[in-house]
């Protein structure tokens, strides 16, 4: 009996074993012959909608179980009070004594033109989701909407998008929006961007330049951190163009027809013997300012009054450093002549004091505020590394200062040659104050890294060279260099607080600017602001010597004849 049971147990085991072998064999052959059938037998993993996605789809998009309708800009959203209450705006409305707390239909009057239906939809939808998609083109609208509903999280996200996308096309709008909605970080970032790029970018893009507000331009002009490329006269020409563009909002400086007319007008003026000292593209603004019959400055006219505070912030004491610059400014007659005469008097007084060795003329014991309010601002761009040497030309109280970039070190040298002793200071030592700032920028011309020195007082002997800064390894080209310098004690400039309405008496007692330095021979004198920095030695310029002429509108040929008549062509 035991043998029978044992035999049956073995037979049953063999049967099941054979079945398992056949099944494995069948499965194996099936996998080889038809993989698709094998796949159908395996379990599939399906990702279900997350709770957030379901809420967004069912409650916001499909508007299920809505308990309140919100109407704005002629569109109605069927929403839910519990989600809207994430906004302090709606929370106060639904939980206070407002009549809307008991209503299921709310109409919101939108007074801000920046708010759109799309931005409202995006902000409402964000209350049902844990994310919001913000495009740089729509960020201001979303910011305006988030500000209306006091949604700080979305405001912060908008600020991040704006800071990352500052460019010549967006900077003005971003700055104005930041001021309007109180986004301090964006306002600071855009202002810093303007300080770096105002003269480098907007001098070549007039249709963008014209949209800079008077308030912003005034703040930039006053800033000691403004990168003035090349000298203060460069900033003056930019302000002249900016003011002209704002006074003529309908004129398109990039219109090809108007540019061609400008060239014809320039040729007629040249043939008539009229010196414009301006590119053909600038002949329109040149004619507008120089052909006025009034003796008073343009700033004294009703049209010029709104711009007075901007030109008061201009360091006009550094506009009289070069004969050609002075002649152009005098002919423009934008700035009151009284300002120019006072500066010339102060320069001459300081030069006499320096020549007689008066120590009270050298800048000393000045606090930072005094230095920053009165210092000269000069700038330069270095596109590539290498040995480079340059000077900013113009009258500098008998000092010929040369900047030298050698490898990773920026030096300054008091250049003195015996053949130039008639025009250079003979004092053994000259004292001055200086601050150096170097910035590395990216493709969007945003500051990547900035290195700034302290304000230091230097005392240089003839031909002495000292280092200004050893560059940090994080500074990579292209580099922007800004020098703040004070060579003499700043004089009192309270006279700039007054813009004389009539300058006839002052003019009759003054020497014409056209006669100042008429016999001077200065081969290094720049013909314009773009030539204010002169390279020395064998080094190659790191930036073009002059930018492309800015296009301008022109008068017709018949009007040109009238212009020549007014100018005694």
Curated annotation (Swiss-Prot):
GO BP terms, alphabetized: germ cell development; negative regulation of DNA-templated transcription; negative regulation of torso signaling pathway; negative regulation of transcription by RNA polymerase III; pole cell fate determination; pole cell formation; proteasome-mediated ubiquitin-dependent protein catabolic process; protein polyubiquitination
Disordered, as annotated region: 17-43, 517-553
Pfam families for this protein: BTB
Protein origin, superkingdom: Eukaryota
GO molecular function: ubiquitin-like ligase-substrate adaptor activity
Coiled coil among keywords: no
A GO-annotated cellular component: nuclear pore
Assigned keywords, A-Z: Cytoplasm, Developmental protein
Positions of the BTB domain: 66-136
Main subcellular localisation: cytoplasm
Protein location: Cytoplasm
SUPFAM superfamilies: POZ domain
UniProt function note: Required for the specification of pole cells and germ cell formation. Mothers with reduced glc function give rise to sterile adult progeny that lack germ cells.
Protein name: Protein germ cell-less
High-level lineage: Eukaryota, Metazoa, Ecdysozoa, Arthropoda, Hexapoda
Name of the coding gene: gcl
